[in-house]
C-alpha cells in the first residue's frame, strides 16, 4: 500500500497563511524569524499529532518562502486591495486576523505568481478557508478572489 501525500505547494500555502497570521498576531516584522518558526514546525512531523499514520507532510520550501516574502514586500498594496473589497458597513480594523492573513497570502499569489492559474489559486485558498474559517468568511474569500482575478491582470 502506498503512503498518502498532500501536495507540497498546498502545504506551503497553509504554512504561509500560518506565518502571516503569526506576523499579525505577534506584531513581529522579522520575516526570517517567522519563516524559521513555521518551517521548523513542518520539518518536525512529530509536532503534528492528529495526522493519520500513513500521511506524509512536506512543503515546498521555495514556494513557502516566495509567498511570505511577497506578502512582506507588498503588504500595503495587499491591505489596500482587501480593504477596498469590504462593504461600507465593515471596518477593516475589525477583520478577523486569520481571515486577513489568508487574504493577504491568497491575493499575493493571485497577483504576483503568474505560473499558478487563477482558478487553482481560488480553489486552493477556498479549500484552506474551508478548514480554517466560518461559512460566511469562506464565501467572502471565494468572492474576493474571484473579483480580483477578474479585475486584475497578472503583475510580472
From Swiss-Prot:
Keywords: RNA-binding, Transcription, Transcription antitermination, Transcription regulation. The keyword Manganese does not apply. It comes from the Bacteria. GO terms for cellular component: cytosol. InterPro entries: NusB-like_sf (IPR035926), NusB_fam (IPR011605), NusB_RsmB_TIM44 (IPR006027). GO terms for molecular function: RNA binding. The keyword Transcription regulation applies. One of its GO terms (biological process) is transcription antitermination. Involved in transcription antitermination. Required for transcription of ribosomal RNA (rRNA) genes. Binds specifically to the boxA antiterminator sequence of the ribosomal RNA (rrn) operons. PANTHER family: ANTITERMINATION NUSB DOMAIN-CONTAINING PROTEIN, N UTILIZATION SUBSTANCE PROTEIN B-RELATED. Belongs to the NusB family. HAMAP family: NusB. This is Transcription antitermination protein NusB. It comes from Rickettsia massiliae (strain Mtu5).
Amino acid at each position: 500500500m502506498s503512503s498518502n501525500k498532500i501536495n507540497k505547494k498546498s502545504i506551503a500555502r497553509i504554512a504561509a497563511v500560518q506565518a502571516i497570521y503569526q506576523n499579525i498576531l505577534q506584531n513581529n516584522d522579522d520575516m526570517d524569524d517567522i519563516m524559521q518558526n513555521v518551517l521548523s514546525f513542518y520539518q518536525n512531523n512529530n509536532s503534528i499529532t492528529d495526522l493519520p499514520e500513513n500521511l506524509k507532510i512536506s512543503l515546498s520550501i521555495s514556494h513557502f518562502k516566495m509567498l511570505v516574502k511577497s506578502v512582506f514586500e507588498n503588504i500595503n498594496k495587499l491591505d489596500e486591495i482587501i480593504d477596498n473589497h469590504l462593504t461600507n458597513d465593515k471596518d477593516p480594523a475589525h477583520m478577523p486576523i486569520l481571515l486577513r492573513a489568508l487574504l493577504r497570502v491568497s491575493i499575493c499569489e493571485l497577483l504576483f505568481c503568474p505560473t499558478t492559474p487563477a482558478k487553482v489559486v481560488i480553489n486552493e485558498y477556498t479549500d484552506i478557508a474551508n478548514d480554517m474559517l466560518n461559512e460566511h468568511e469562506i464565501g467572502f474569500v471565494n468572492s474576493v478572489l474571484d473579483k480580483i482575478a477578474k479585475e486584475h491582470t497578472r503583475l510580472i
